[in-house]
Amino acid sequence: IREVGFLRPPQVDAFELYVYLKEIQGNPTIKELYRRLLFPEGTPMDVLSLTAEQLEEIKQKKALLEALDSELQGLAYPNWLFALGMGTGKTILMATMIFYDFILAEHYPEDGRFAKNALVFAPDTTIIDSLREIQDFDYSKVIPQEYTLFLSSNLKFHYLSDVQTELSVLPGSAYNIIVSNVQKIILKKQGSNSNGQQTLFPVVKDM
């Protein structure tokens, strides 16, 4: 990516952070990531050996984790937010992240860190057409040339730009990129006890 120079510095920084979270941190949830940051390995937790000030600091950090968990409503999957300014190339960045996941998922199919399908939300139906850039741009600008054939042969795009458009994805299929607006997504029950999270993420390692 740095050799080709197609991505801008904010895109490169965000992508490197994404890879770091996936490969070094092991694809943690936000709560787990914060827990590691607040309580690094080796942090003394023995009450008898801590000062009152240290105990108060630990208490405050634990309260932060509890508040974070409440805010996230106990989400059991990574839910990171990458905030980039307008015009910095968020669409291309999303595509790069998706391609990275798909390529690694192909090489390591049992590794649950890497997604095998992607769902891209647009804030409104008018934005969906602009997201076709994910499909149309030159993949070799963001991935090594030897992987472009794999992507062009296996990617399946689904644009749900109309209310009447139905999603037709084969159960168990991989490398689907579904682009829709938030109003369009309807989670179908797969069982009497299913909920939205279970439907979107039935088995984490298969995503």
Each PLM stretch: what is its role?
Residues 1-207:
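RecA-like P-loop NTPase motor core of helicase/translocase proteins
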